């Protein structure tokens, strides 16, 4: 029997994982639909509005110094805004799932096991969902609202203490302690967000080929798939590229060709045998400079 055949137990396990993934996609779609109910013309609860909306006032006063030309320009701008394409996160997520499914099928056709491939794909889907659809905080219950209302009722003792606190400077030691506590917790969240964003952008271009200078004074094509590494390992090595964390913090696109060259030099003997390292270092520096400038803008 050929070693390339897939065991039936692996197929059953893979089908079960795919069914679970479908249920997860349906759940995410349902949550998105409920979250966008107000865009579909469905009524929504007034409690969901931000605080301070009730304080807004609509003024009927029109500036007398406004010329008719200004009104026409404003109308034209409003008309152009109406024809602008609205970003739909559901369709973007569906496109991402289609690309991920194509990648999964291509890996299975090459003879890779479903367990290994699905674990990698599931991490990519999880990072995409966490980066694009962060969980919403739970709504306060009526009991919490009642407790907050009771706490806000001032009595005479509180009024006296507030009056004294206004006349005397308040100590800032608790604020410093809270700030220190927050700075101790932020690094773990930042590390997770950094790895998720790198994994997301690498997964989107996993099979895309990039041009690299070869030792024979020409070029050759290479992609992340040819590294034959897990996505987690690629992310860990790519984090060593200088300036990557700053680009992610500014929400810019990552220099994927530079990252691919860096990971290839660190892990792939075949890549090192093909590439002209002097030209590659210059190319990587140019990519870093260009993407750093674009992320600042």
UniProtKB/Swiss-Prot annotation:
Q: Which SUPFAM superfamilies match?
A: Phosphoprotein M1, C-terminal domain (SSF118173)
Q: Which residues carry this modification: Phosphoserine?
A: 64, 207, 268
Q: How is it modified after translation?
A: Phosphorylated by host PKC and by an unknown kinase.
Which residue ranges are recorded for the region named Disordered?
57-83, 153-176
Q: Name one Pfam family in it.
A: PP_M1
- Compositionally biased, Polar residues: which spans? 57-69
State the Gene Ontology BP annotations.
symbiont-mediated suppression of host innate immune response; symbiont-mediated suppression of host JAK-STAT cascade via inhibition of STAT1 activity; symbiont-mediated suppression of host JAK-STAT cascade via inhibition of STAT2 activity; symbiont-mediated suppression of host type I interferon-mediated signaling pathway; viral transcription
Instruction: Give the record's keywords alphabetically.
Output: Chaperone, Host cytoplasm, Host-virus interaction, Inhibition of host innate immune response by virus, Inhibition of host interferon signaling pathway by virus, Inhibition of host STAT1 by virus, Inhibition of host STAT2 by virus, Interferon antiviral system evasion, Phosphoprotein, Viral immunoevasion, Viral RNA replication, Virion
User: Cellular component GO terms, alphabetically?
Assistant: host cell cytoplasm; virion component
Looking at the record's lineage, which domain of life comes first?
Viruses
Q: Which CDD domains match?
A: RABV_P-protein-C_like (cd21032)
Which InterPro entries did the record assign? PP_M1-like, PP_M1_C, RABV_P-like_C
- Short motif Nuclear export signal, span: 49-58
Q: Where is the composition biased (Acidic residues)?
A: 71-83
Question: One MF term from GO for this chain?
Answer: RNA-directed RNA polymerase activity
Where, by residue number, is the motif Nuclear localization signal?
Answer: 208-211
Relate the protein's function as given in its record. Non catalytic polymerase cofactor and regulatory protein that plays a role in viral transcription and replication. Stabilizes the RNA polymerase L to the N-RNA template and binds the soluble protein N, preventing it from encapsidating non-genomic RNA. Also inhibits host IFN-alpha and IFN-beta signaling by binding and retaining phosphorylated STAT1 in the cytoplasm or by inhibiting the DNA binding of STAT1 in the nucleus.
Q: How does it assemble?
A: Homotrimer when phosphorylated. This trimer is stabilized by binding to the L protein. Binds soluble protein N, and ribonucleocapsid. Interacts with host STAT1, STAT2 and PML.
Family that this chain belongs to: Belongs to the lyssavirus protein P family.
Protein name as catalogued: Phosphoprotein
- What organism is recorded for this protein? West Caucasian bat virus
């Amino acid at each position: 029997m050929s070693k390339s055949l897939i065991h039936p137990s692996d197929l059953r396990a893979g089908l079960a994982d795919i069914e679970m993934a479908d249920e997860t996609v349906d759940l995410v779609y349902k949550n998105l639909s409920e979250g966008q109910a107000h865009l579909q013309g469905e009524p929504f609860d007034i409690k969901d509005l931000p605080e301070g909306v009730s304080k807004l006032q609509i003024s009927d006063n029109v500036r007398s110094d406004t010329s008719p030309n200004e009104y026409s320009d404003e109308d034209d701008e409003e008309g152009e805004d109406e024809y602008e394409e609205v970003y739909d996160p559901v369709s973007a997520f569906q496109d991402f799932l289609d690309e991920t499914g194509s990648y999964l099928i291509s890996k299975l056709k090459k003879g890779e096991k479903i367990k290994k491939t699905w674990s990698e794909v599931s991490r990519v889907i999880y990072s995409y969902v966490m980066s694009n659809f962060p969980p919403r905080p739970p709504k306060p219950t009526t009991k919490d609202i009642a407790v907050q209302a009771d706490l806000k009722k001032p009595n005479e003792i509180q009024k006296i203490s507030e009056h004294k606190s206004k006349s005397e400077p308040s100590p800032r030691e608790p604020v410093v302690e809270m700030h220190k506590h927050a700075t101790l917790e932020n690094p773990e969240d930042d590390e997770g967000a950094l790895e998720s964003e790198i994994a997301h952008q690498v997964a989107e271009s996993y099979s895309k080929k990039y041009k690299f200078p070869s030792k024979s004074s020409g070029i050759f094509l290479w992609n992340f798939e040819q590294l034959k590494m897990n996505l987690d390992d690629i992310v860990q090595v790519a984090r060593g590229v200088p300036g990557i964390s700053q680009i992610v913090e500014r929400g810019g696109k990552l220099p994927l060709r530079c990252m691919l060259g860096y990971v290839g030099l660190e892990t792939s003997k075949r890549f090192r045998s093909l590439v002209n390292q002097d030209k590659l270092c210059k190319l990587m520096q140019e990519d870093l400079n260009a993407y750093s400038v674009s992320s600042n803008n």
